[in-house]
C-alpha cells in the first residue's frame, strides 16, 4: 500500500497540494484523474522522491520514501515522468536493459536479458529493438519508455500520463496490457490521467 499523509506543497504563494491524505491499496491499477494544474504529477513526484517532501509523509510498502536508501527504493518503486532525460542515441534494447540497472549494476545476467526480451515481446517492440530512440515515432518511444519501467520489476509502478503520444488504438491496447501485467505480477500501478475514458481499464 502507498500511504499519503497530510502532504502540502505550494509555489510562489500558490497552493498546489493542500493537506492531501489518501491510501492507495495494494495491487491493481489506481488512476489519479483531474485537469492540468491539479497537482497530480506533483504528488506522483513526491511518491518517487523526485523532489523533497517538506510537509507530510509518504510510505510505500511500509518504507518511508524520504528516508529509504536510494538503492532499496529503486528496487521498490519505478516511475515514468512526462519529461525524461534519457539519451536519445540509445537503442530500444539498451533502454530496456537500463531499467535493469539497479540489479545488474552494468553486468547483465541471462535473467536480465530474458526479462528484456519478454518486455520487447509484450510491448510489441521486437521490430524496433535495435533502433535508436531518435528513429522512433512518439508512440513507439512512449511504449519503449513504459517497457523500460516494467523491466525494473518493482512492486510499485508510477506512470505520469502514460498515454501521451499514443493514438486511440495503442492507448487502448496499452491500458489492457498494463492491467494484464499488473494482475499477473501482483503489482501496484498508479497512473496519472487527464482523460476519463481509459479509467475502465483501472481497478480504482
Language-model segments: what does each one mean?
Residues 157-161:
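Catalytic Walker B motif of ABC-type/P-loop ATPase nucleotide-binding domains
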Residues 33-35:
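The feature captures the beta-strand-to-loop junction immediately N-terminal to the Walker
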Residues 56-64, 73:
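Conserved ABC transporter NBD signature motif
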Amino acid at each position: 500500500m502507498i500511504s499519503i499523509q497530510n502532504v502540502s506543497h505550494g509555489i510562489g504563494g500558490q497552493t498546489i497540494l493542500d493537506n492531501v491524505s489518501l491510501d492507495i491499496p495494494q495491487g491493481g491499477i489506481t488512476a489519479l484523474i483531474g485537469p492540468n494544474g491539479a497537482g497530480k504529477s506533483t504528488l506522483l513526484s513526491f511518491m518517487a522522491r523526485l523532489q523533497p517532501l517538506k510537509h507530510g509523509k509518504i510510505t510505500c510498502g511500509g518504507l518511508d520514501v524520504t528516508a529509504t536508501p536510494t538503492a532499496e527504493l529503486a528496487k521498490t518503486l519505478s516511475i515514468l515522468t512526462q519529461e525524461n532525460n534519457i539519451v536519445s542515441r540509445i537503442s530500444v534494447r539498451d533502454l530496456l536493459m537500463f531499467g535493469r540497472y539497479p540489479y545488474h549494476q552494468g553486468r547483465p545476467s541471462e535473467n536480465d536479458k530474458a526479462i528484456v526480451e519478454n518486455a520487447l515481446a509484450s510491448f510489441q517492440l521486437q521490430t524496433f529493438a535495435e533502433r535508436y530512440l531518435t528513429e522512433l515515432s512518439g508512440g513507439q518511444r512512449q511504449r519503449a519508455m513504459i517497457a523500460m519501467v516494467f523491466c525494473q520489476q518493482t512492486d510499485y509502478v508510477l506512470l505520469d500520463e502514460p498515454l501521451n503520444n499514443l493514438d486511440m488504438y495503442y492507448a487502448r491496447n496499452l491500458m489492457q496490457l498494463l492491467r494484464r501485467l499488473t494482475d499477473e505480477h501482483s503489482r501496484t500501478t498508479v497512473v496519472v490521467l487527464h482523460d476519463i475514458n481509459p479509467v475502465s481499464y483501472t481497478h480504482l
